[in-house]
Amino acid sequence: MGGKTFMLMAGGTGGHIFPALAVADSLRARGHHVIWLGSKDSMEERIVPQYGIRLETLAIKGVRGNGIKRKLMLPVTLYQTVREAQRIIRKHRVECVIGFGGFVTFPGGLAAKLLGVPIVIHEQNAVAGLSNRHLSRWAKRVLYAFPKAFSHEGGLVGNPVRADISNLPVPAERFQGREGRLKILVVGGSLGADVLNKTVPQALALLPDNARPQMYHQSGRGKLGSLQADYDALGVKAECVEFITDMVSAYRDADLVICRAGALTIAELTAAGLGALLVPYPHAVDDHQTANARFMVQAEAGLLLPQTQLTAEKLAEILGGLNREKCLKWAENARTLALPHSADDVAEAAIACAA
């Protein structure tokens, strides 16, 4: 049986999981084998098997901000999970581990270190997570999506995104021939963002009818009815859906996006070439979403709107001052930030480390 065996370590959020899946695809396309190390009762436990990848799990959860009992048990938990990760690495004869972040990454990486298996890490956010910060001391390659996340030279590779998003036509081609109202996409993640669901309809109601953009608004799970009711009560027309299954078409048709600033969102915006009004999730670990947002804003590819400053009046003022020319400029600037070969770059770095 040809090919090398790689163990991907990622979990907890889509921002860790989906970039890792893109790298898994790249490795498998090159004839290599992939297994996945995740946590029990987790998002990755629901998602990863759908892609035909063997999933192994550890019984571990995060410790930051959690109760004193869990912190006191950490040495025992770490010992047990490292031993289990070592067993998994030996069982599958893993030749290189790739850490993307999440609770499971540290014990998996420590197990690899103790067994002499090469470690590669990929950091998706502008502020490196705790697991990756620790593993960077032992890693053979340190890769990252945002400048300054780490100081290691030659590690800037961007965030892996789906090829169909990277392959969208350039902004100038997409925007050509567009007339009439701006088309704005609102996404708060798969669970939605209550603050966007509440504020966006109110902001549109403050604008004259002929100045209102055309809205395509993802409510998030279980929130469609209340969102549509709010739009209807305010007399504002909008197309609302619970979850957008075809994000490629949504990005293709939008002039602008109103969204959070997770690493995966920023990667998709730059890959597609779309400007954004970015409202970072204020409770993200190390406030990394604000740092992610600044990456786009500094390139004049959008605006940063801290949640504490987000009001219907402020948003209405911003929307009222937009035009398609400005949106196109933001979109073009966003596209210049894209690193569309990220998944292949991470895969090739790991293959070289496993050699």
Curated annotation (Swiss-Prot):
Keywords assigned by UniProt?
A: Cell cycle, Cell division, Cell inner membrane, Cell membrane, Cell shape, Cell wall biogenesis/degradation, Glycosyltransferase, Membrane, Peptidoglycan synthesis, Transferase
Q: Which SUPFAM superfamilies match?
A: UDP-Glycosyltransferase/glycogen phosphorylase
Q: Which reaction does it catalyse?
A: di-trans,octa-cis-undecaprenyl diphospho-N-acetyl-alpha-D-muramoyl-L-alanyl-D-glutamyl-meso-2,6-diaminopimeloyl-D-alanyl-D-alanine + UDP-N-acetyl-alpha-D-glucosamine = di-trans,octa-cis-undecaprenyl diphospho-[N-acetyl-alpha-D-glucosaminyl-(1->4)]-N-acetyl-alpha-D-muramoyl-L-alanyl-D-glutamyl-meso-2,6-diaminopimeloyl-D-alanyl-D-alanine + UDP + H(+)
* UniProt xrefs under InterPro entries: GlcNAc_MurG (IPR006009), Glyco_trans_28_C (IPR007235), GlycoTrans_28_N (IPR004276)
As recorded in UniProt, its EC number(s) are 2.4.1.227
Q: What class of enzyme is it?
A: transferase
Q: Where in the cell is it found?
A: Cell inner membrane
Q: Where are the transmembrane segments?
A: none
Q: Where does UDP-N-acetyl-alpha-D-glucosamine bind?
A: 13-15, 125, 162, 190, 244, 289
Q: What topology does the record note for this protein and the membrane?
A: Peripheral membrane protein
- Listed GO MF terms: UDP-N-acetyl-D-glucosamine:N-acetylmuramoyl-L-alanyl-D-glutamyl-meso-2,6-diaminopimelyl-D-alanyl-D-alanine-diphosphoundecaprenol 4-beta-N-acetylglucosaminlytransferase activity; undecaprenyldiphospho-muramoylpentapeptide beta-N-acetylglucosaminyltransferase activity
Record's GO cellular component terms: plasma membrane
Example GO biological process term? peptidoglycan biosynthetic process
Q: In which pathway does it act?
A: Cell wall biogenesis; peptidoglycan biosynthesis
UniProt cross-references to HAMAP family, sorted A to Z: MurG
Please give the family membership noted in the entry. Belongs to the glycosyltransferase 28 family. MurG subfamily.
This molecule's function is given as: Cell wall formation. Catalyzes the transfer of a GlcNAc subunit on undecaprenyl-pyrophosphoryl-MurNAc-pentapeptide (lipid intermediate I) to form undecaprenyl-pyrophosphoryl-MurNAc-(pentapeptide)GlcNAc (lipid intermediate II).
Write the protein's name.
UDP-N-acetylglucosamine--N-acetylmuramyl-(pentapeptide) pyrophosphoryl-undecaprenol N-acetylglucosamine transferase
